[in-house]
């Protein structure tokens, strides 16, 4: 499942050093050799050329993978997504043209298209509400005998938080903060688990 594998990649940044939608986009880009997808969806409209690339405004409610192939309406490939820019409610992206495509040959308003399997829902990059303070109280009242196990799960939650940090469209926007909170939850989860484990040992 290419889309699922993509969504579990290591980042919504451009290139390896930018946080790695490159990992997902790279795998997606390899599929281009098998031809364009059966159907394509509107991804964005051309705004202007900059440094040899096409700068576009997104007209799709979802977020494109980095390195995702971009097409014209007739499925002619024109390049790949290079960067995703702007706040989550006003997304822009750039297209690195493939050989033979000139960025200045397009005019404002020209549409670009993408395969549906190269998109992620915006919700993946929105901050999640913090759990109510009372949620942790039942764990404390459950007894020390089970504290060690719960502490372990607290650590695991932090582990899941870390990929969100790596996987952030917010590496340059909002998602990075989520990752940070995920990491913070990990550190909090760790001491809670540790203290319970210690208390159990003393018991």
Swiss-Prot record:
Keyword annotations from UniProtKB, A to Z: Nucleus, Repeat, Ribonucleoprotein, Ribosome biogenesis, RNA-binding, rRNA processing
Subcellular location: Nucleus, Nucleolus
Record Gene3D superfamilies: Probable tRNA pseudouridine synthase domain
A single GO molecular function term of this UniProt record: box H/ACA snoRNA binding
The keyword Repeat is annotated on this UniProt entry: yes
Composition skew (Gly residues), residue ranges: 1-29, 144-203
Disordered as annotated region, ranges: 1-32, 124-203
UniProt region (RGG-box 2), positions on chain: 146-198
Region (RGG-box 1): 4-29
Function: Non-catalytic component of the H/ACA small nucleolar ribonucleoprotein (H/ACA snoRNP), which catalyzes pseudouridylation of rRNA and is required for ribosome biogenesis. This involves the isomerization of uridine such that the ribose is subsequently attached to C5, instead of the normal N1. Pseudouridine ('psi') residues may serve to stabilize the conformation of rRNAs. The H/ACA snoRNP complex also mediates pseudouridylation of other types of RNAs. The H/ACA snoRNP complex mediates pseudouridylation at position 93 in U2 snRNA.
Assembly: Component of the small nucleolar ribonucleoprotein particles containing H/ACA-type snoRNAs (H/ACA snoRNPs).
Family note: Belongs to the GAR1 family.
Record's protein name: H/ACA ribonucleoprotein complex subunit GAR1
Gene from which this protein is expressed: GAR1
